[in-house]
C-alpha cells in the first residue's frame, strides 16, 4: 500500500459524502491526518447514461465497472459504494471487505402538494427508476402514473420542483447523508414498502489479498451490518437479482439472531410472494439462500418466466 490511501468513488454528492464518511472513520480509528488519504473521483457508465432505465442499459454493474477496473489496476486502494448498487457477482480478484454501520434502510416519499402516496390525486405522476419501487407504488396505488426518474438525488429533487412529477421515492439514508432528511414528507414502513437488499449500507471493496488495506478496514467494519448484508446479498444472488427483477430483502440482527424478510413482486405490482426466516446470525448467507429457494418454490418458475 502507498503512503496515501486512495479512495475510489463516483462523483455524485451522495457518493462523495460516503467516501468522506469512510475517510473520517479511518482517520479516527487510526489517528491519521487528512493528508494520508486521497479521494479519487471516477466517472461511471451509470452516471453518463441518463436517458433509459438501468435494466435496459446493462444493470447495476454500470455504477461499479470503471471503479472496479481502477481498483484492479492499482489506481485506487479501496472503492466505496452504496451496497444496494453492487452486483452480487464481483470481478475476479475483488471482494467486499467491510461495511460501515447501516443507516435507516427505509424509503422516503418526497411530495410537493401531496405529502404521502395516499394523498396523491388519481393519475398523478410519481417518478422512480427502480423497478422495485415502481412495482410497490403500483401495488399501493394502481391508479397512479409511474414515470422513469433517473439522476442523482439533487437531479430528482429538481425534477420535482419543475413539476415533472408530483412525488418521488428516495432512500432515506441517502437524504440523511446529504443533510436533506427534511425534504422527506413521509417514511415508508418496512413491511409495506420493503427496501432493496443492501439499502442504507456503505460497502468497501478491496483487492483480495491486500492485507495492509484489510487490516486498516477491520477497525471500521460493523459486524452486524456485514451479517445482514451477507444474508440479503445471498437472497439476491440466488434469485439472480439485477436491475431487471423487482426484489426486496431486509435483515436485522439482535443479540446474535438474524431475522430476514424478503419479497418478489411482478413489475405491475399485481402479484407478489413473501418469505420470513430467522436463525443464528453466523448462518446469514445460508438463511438468505434458503429464503430465496422458499420464495421461488412458492411463486413457481412461471412467475419468473413471465417478467424476468
Curated annotation (Swiss-Prot):
The porphobilinogen subunits are added to the dipyrromethane group. The modification S-(dipyrrolylmethanemethyl)cysteine is found at residue 243. Tetrapolymerization of the monopyrrole PBG into the hydroxymethylbilane pre-uroporphyrinogen in several discrete steps. GO terms for molecular function: hydroxymethylbilane synthase activity. Pathway: Porphyrin-containing compound metabolism; protoporphyrin-IX biosynthesis; coproporphyrinogen-III from 5-aminolevulinate: step 2/4. Its EC number is 2.5.1.61. This is Porphobilinogen deaminase.
Amino acid at each position: 500500500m502507498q503512503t496515501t490511501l486512495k479512495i475510489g468513488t463516483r462523483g455524485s454528492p451522495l457518493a462523495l459524502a460516503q467516501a468522506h464518511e469512510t475517510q473520517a472513520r479511518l482517520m479516527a480509528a487510526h489517528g491519521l491526518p487528512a493528508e494520508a488519504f486521497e479521494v479519487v473521483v471516477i466517472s461511471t457508465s451509470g452516471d453518463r447514461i441518463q436517458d433509459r432505465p438501468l435494466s435496459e442499459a446493462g444493470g447495476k454493474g454500470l455504477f461499479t465497472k470503471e471503479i472496479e477496473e481502477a481498483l484492479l489496476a492499482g489506481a485506487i486502494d479501496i472503492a466505496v459504494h452504496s451496497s444496494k448498487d453492487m452486483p452480487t457477482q464481483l470481478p475476479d480478484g475483488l471482494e467486499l471487505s467491510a461495511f460501515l454501520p447501516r443507516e435507516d434502510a427505509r424509503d422516503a416519499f418526497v411530495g410537493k402538494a401531496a405529502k404521502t402516496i395516499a394523498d396523491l390525486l388519481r393519475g398523478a405522476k410519481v417518478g422512480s427508476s427502480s423497478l422495485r419501487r415502481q412495482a410497490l407504488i403500483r401495488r399501493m396505488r394502481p391508479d397512479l402514473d409511474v414515470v422513469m426518474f433517473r439522476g442523482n438525488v439533487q437531479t430528482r429533487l429538481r425534477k420535482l420542483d419543475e413539476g415533472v412529477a408530483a412525488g418521488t421515492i428516495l432512500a432515506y439514508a441517502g437524504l440523511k447523508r446529504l443533510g436533506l432528511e427534511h425534504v422527506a414528507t413521509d417514511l415508508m414502513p418496512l413491511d409495506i414498502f420493503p427496501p432493496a437488499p443492501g439499502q442504507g449500507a456503505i460497502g468497501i471493496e478491496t483487492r483480495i489479498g491486500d492485507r495492509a488495506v484489510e487490516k486498516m478496514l477491520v477497525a471500521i467494519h460493523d459486524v452486524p451490518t456485514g451479517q445482514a448484508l451477507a444474508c440479503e446479498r445471498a437472497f439476491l444472488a440466488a434469485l439472480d437479482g439485477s436491475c431487471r427483477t423487482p426484489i426486496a430483502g431486509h435483515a436485522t440482527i439482535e443479540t446474535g439472531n438474524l431475522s430476514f424478510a424478503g419479497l418478489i413482486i411482478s413489475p405491475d405490482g399485481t402479484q407478489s410472494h413473501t418469505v420470513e426466516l430467522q436463525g443464528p446470525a453466523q448462518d446469514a448467507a445460508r438463511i438468505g439462500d434458503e429464503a430465496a429457494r422458499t420464495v421461488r418454490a412458492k411463486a413457481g418458475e412461471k412467475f419468473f418466466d413471465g417478467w424476468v
